[in-house]
Amino acid sequence: MEVLNIHERELDADPMRIGALIDSLASKEDGLWPKHVWPRMDFDRPLGVGAKGGHGPIRYFVQEYTPGKSIRFRFTGPKGFDGYHGYEIVSSPQQPVILRHTLKMSTYGSGILSWPLVYRPMHDALMEDSLATAQVSLGLHPTIQPWSQWVRILRWVISRGKGRPQTTPSNAFNSDDQKQRAG
């Protein structure tokens, strides 16, 4: 089955500040990944082409990386996923800046069922939380998409009843706040 899944937000912010969020992925200062409610994104080395890692059961490596602009991750797991996902900044003069996450893959074997039943709803919720985290990190009011009942059930089952509830990413990294506190 062919899959194309896109999540995006128009952000009223300088593209360089948005690009810094992409560059912060998997770092202590990560201002894009919703680590407050989802498994952290981790890699075997600093963010760069070839870095291997993932989040939870989703495994991948950095296939392409243009600092401040885009990053693409190539799936290595779970079995049944062949493709990539990544973030990019889409901007043009006189147009709003868009932060976009694209997942494009073919599913086969167990992925044909696991994608629509488990991974897609979880992915959709995670990506919406990621974009809300970006908004908070940029000092913008976040657009929160409430988790579906199915996502809440999946999180409860997967965490054996210990899953964290959805929260506003108020503790997301904000570089301007950090500079003000330091100065």
Segments (PLM) and residue ranges:
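Beta-strand/loop substructures that line and gate deep hydrophobic ligand-binding cavities in soluble
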Residues: 77-149
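Short, exposed beta-strand/loop patches in secreted or surface proteins that constitute
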Residues: 38-42, 60-65
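Hydrophobic ligand-binding cavity/cleft-lining segments
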Residues: 1-44, 156-183
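Hydrophobic pocket/interface hotspot
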Residues: 18-25, 62, 71-73, 99-101, ...
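Low-complexity, charge- and small-residue-enriched intrinsically disordered regions
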Residues: 48-51, 55-57, 117-129, 159-176
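Short, surface-exposed coil-to-beta transition loops
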Residues: 4-6, 55-60, 81-86
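Short beta-strand segments that buttress and anchor functional surface loops
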Residues: 46-54, 72-78
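Short, conserved beta-turn/loop elements at beta-strand boundaries and strand-helix junctions
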Residues: 66-71, 94
